[in-house]
Amino acid sequence: MKYTKQNFMMSVLGIIIYVTDLIVDIWVSVRFFHEGQYVFSALALSFMLFGTLVAQCFSYSWFKADLKKAGQESQHCFLLLHCLQGGVFTRYWFALKRGYHAAFKYDSNTSNFVEEQIDLHKEVIDRVTDLSMLRLFETYLEGCPQLILQLYILLEHGQANFSQYAAIMVSCCAISWSTVDYQVALRKSLPDKKLLNGLCPKITYLFYKLFTLLSWMLSVVLLLFLNVKIALFLLLFLWLLGIIWAFKNNTQFCTCISMEFLYRIVVGFILIFTFFNIKGQNTKCPMSCYYIVRVLGTLGILTVFWVCPLNIFNPDYFIPISITIVLTLLLGILFLIVYYGSFHPNRSAETKCDEIDGKPVLRECRMRYFLME
């Protein structure tokens, strides 16, 4: 596996989106505060801090594990950086610095790679993979609740300022980018997975995730208008089910028990919004059950609003929103079927080995125990 110039540009774009997302979240929170909407300001800030703090915890835990594996002592400067919310930026610095060296200093077309050059590419791929996992954590922990909040405010007031539109756009971009970036990193870091070559598989996977996610978020927003307590109870119930599912599957992502417990809590939260294979096994049945429940839940929420219409927001919005929910859900399921029917990373057939090479050894990395697609 080689870290290419295209991969480097994706990493650069990734940090640009990451920084933009943080700036817009802070901007929206401050704007709400100045307008006297203290609850919305606190919620926006809390979502941002929640996602960032969890990402910093995992980042520092991985730094410690990597140093221990290398036989080095844990450095206090790394702890200080993560306490100051600089862990992800530190990782981006190391990844971009080494990635530039790997992508531009060595000619990827030459077959005359020495062992040192191969190790450099492996190191960069591992660093970028760690970043993609952290971004996936932060996106779903912060971006999804933030997007629901902004959609709720938009429908409640019937209009929004530029900062709110910016927050919605950036949240969608962050979710889209982290999802595709995660897919690319997954395939690149695990040699037994087929590479995600071409634009079509990436777009198909992106639309599958984005459409099913948007449909569910709009449904949750409608439920919030119906009854906030019922909506929160449903989300907490789904979170609890996700945590139980993670414990039932006995995930083994972290070496530390406390971090593994946190990981399962985070997995449960992510499962509220979208499905991931949390154990790397055949999940045809669980995925089918997940999206059947998703369809039934969405139709149930829409039925309640159609049978008992509530004058809680501009009724002119309800018909377009209902159509959007149904269409995005159908399109999401359609792209899901196309993706798993044509582009799913089934384990490639075992290659024949000659007497010199022997049987290839699967490379050990964190991604192998992380969320699969």
UniProtKB/Swiss-Prot annotation:
Regulation: Activated upon caspase cleavage to generate the XK-related protein 9, processed form. Does not act prior the onset of apoptosis.
Protein name listed in UniProt: XK-related protein 9
Subcellular location: Cell membrane
Coiled-coil annotated residue ranges, if any: none
InterPro entries: XK-rel, XK-related_scramblase
Residue stretches spanning the membrane: 8-28, 38-58, 166-186, 203-223, 224-244, 256-276, 295-315, 318-338
Residues flagged as site, Cleavage: D357, G358
Region forming the signal peptide: none
Entry membrane topology: Multi-pass membrane protein
Similarity comment: Belongs to the XK family.
Keywords on record: Apoptosis, Cell membrane, Membrane, Transmembrane, Transmembrane helix
Keyword Cell membrane: yes
GO cellular component, one term: plasma membrane
Biological processes, Gene Ontology terms: apoptotic process
Pfam families linked: XK-related
Encoding gene (name): XKR9
